[in-house]
Amino acid sequence: MCVIFAFPLIFLFEKLFGFMSDFTLLELCDLNTPLLRLLSQKIPGTFQHSLQVANLAEEACYKIGGNALLVRTGAMYHDIGKINNPRFFTENQVGEVSPHEDLNSEESAKIIINHVISGIEIAKEYNLPEAIIDFIRTHHGTTTTRFFLSNYKKEHQGEVINEDLFRYPGPIPFSKETAVLMMADSVEASSRSLKKYDAIAIDELVDRIINHQISENQFINSDITFRDINQIKKIFKKRLMNIYHVRIEYPR
């Protein structure tokens, strides 16, 4: 009987004080929720990416003392903005020519960047809590779409280039959980393009991606330490080696 009366109180406190209970997070993580079902049916490539990111981020957050269930939930929804233009994202291009072939670098960058804005709009339409929308806002921080920016620079050598045209709107991560999601998202996505899967390649990939994010000051507003980041790197490397069935070769 007490449990029955407790549920309305939980929702009341969440509305009044802006926090989310584990009960609410577990509900949002349910793969049968309308938005996650739409994600899995319409863009299965992005859905699988989100699942892998959720697994990476959850384990890392648990290890460094963050809210593992919160980051898992945020990870499941972070890319919902891709629903509007699924074919422009590599994980959804199965054996087909990329539609970016018909666009210039600025147009391509605009579409890629817009998945963050679209994601926020969709999240609000489905009444997702602000704490989950924060993961959508921050998962690219203020980084650039490096591939299209690099192509643009090659095409416009000697010209003054406005890099802001290729930059995500931010904000940068402002908590352990949002910082971990940014790392997990970039590492998981980049791991799919490795030409060779071995311990050296995975080590180099994880270090390069996260060190670049550090160099771009993406984590200066989050309460994450270098010790935390080293722990996160170790977990990502171990997880990726398991995912890609990499065997560790021991010296004879």
Region roles according to the model:
Residues 6-16, 31, 72-79, 161-166, ...:
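Short, mixed-charge, low-aromatic patches
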Residues 1, 20, 76, 182-183, ...:
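Detector for methionine-enriched segments
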Residues 36-49, 54-199, 203, 212, ...:
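Divalent metal-dependent catalytic cores for phosphoryl transfer on phosphate-bearing substrates
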Residues 1-40, 44:
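Generic detector of multi-pass transmembrane helix bundles and their immediately adjacent loops
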Residues 25-29, 50, 87-89, 148-152, ...:
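Short coil/turn segments at secondary-structure boundaries
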Residues 13, 17, 42, 190-252:
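In a subset of proteins, long, contiguous C-terminal domains/tails are tracked
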Residues 1, 5, 9, 125-126, ...:
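C-terminal domain-closing interface element
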